Amino acid sequence: MFDDAVATQDTVTQLVAAIRRVARCVPSAGEVVAAVCMLDYTRPGKPDIDWDDPAAKADLVSRLVNDALAVLAVLAVLCGPDTPGRDDAAADALGLLALVAGQDVEPADGSDGTGGRWVIARKVAPDRVISTVDRQARHTRKSRSQRRDGYRAHLAAEPDTGLITDCEMTMATGQDNTDAAVGVRMAGRDRFHPITEPALAEEDGGLEIHGDSAYGSGQARADYRDAGHETVIKPKPLTRAVPGGFTADDFTVDDPAGTVTCPAGHTRAMSRSRTVTFGRLCADCPLRVQCTTAKTGRSMTIHEHDGLLRAARAQARTPEFKAAYPTRAGIERTVAHVATQNGRRVKLRYLGTTKNDAWLHTRAAALNLRALLRHGLTRNAGVWTLATA
């Protein structure tokens, strides 16, 4: 994760900035804002209230949201998509205002949303915009205790040399930006280990892909398999419904038959959504204390790629996997070189994924050049060569 180049904005700051942007960018919006809004948006900074008074802050949130909704309602009529003078900047400003007016707030207690009373929601909206200055920066969690704002960088590298073979900067949230999804994309556009049809037929032409558990989703493993790659990716640990009790691997899944058999030998059919409920079969089961605490008995959802995930967990227990997996640790040094400078984490200087992705590629190229020079890269008779031992 890289920290973004802008400050994370609170809800009040975002609403004020978004309304001001609409007033600047949308035709006739300045007059609309002055006419329908309760607050004065021509004054710089935040509205002047007693910030130590919770009631005053709550009232300000309601006023800001109501102002935003009022502006949007009027401009939806006066400045539709076909209005002369409306350009991309105007459309973006209106879209941003609509987004920030709803992403962080919810109706106050006892309100159905029509009374004009709003409060800041006690949750983080999925894919939340954290700044009106950089609308692609996102809030995410590296773990339950580590929260970060910015962008996510992905690297592919050769474990023996540490040379970076591919990289990509993405937003920190979104299904297309997960480690697993980007890992599959990078493997698919690999230019250094081309796979030919004869190689696929011989089953020796794919890559050997190493990664931590974030790169090993069921879909990613299926994609790697279909592309002819081998994986040395750590599986995610299984959770137990009861401490010390059974895991999903203690249940037998028969995909062709569409059934699941529990450790006690009871078999149930899976539903179309791949859920299975053992229900009353658990009532007198002697193994219940190891299986579930639910009054209605054990229920579970079987993953679409359950077979691949089970195979990955079985692979992780083999001596071959345990010997090969530490290879991935060598890439951590490369990651540290990309993410830090003189012992400090690098902070991005650009806005948006496009410019930051270009910066990441430039940094990766520079680090590769440094690594090659360290390995003896030299220029001989106009040709770059690596010195041999």
Question: Can you say where each PLM-predicted feature lies in the sequence?
Answer:
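Anion-binding and metal-coordination hotspots
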Residues: 1-389
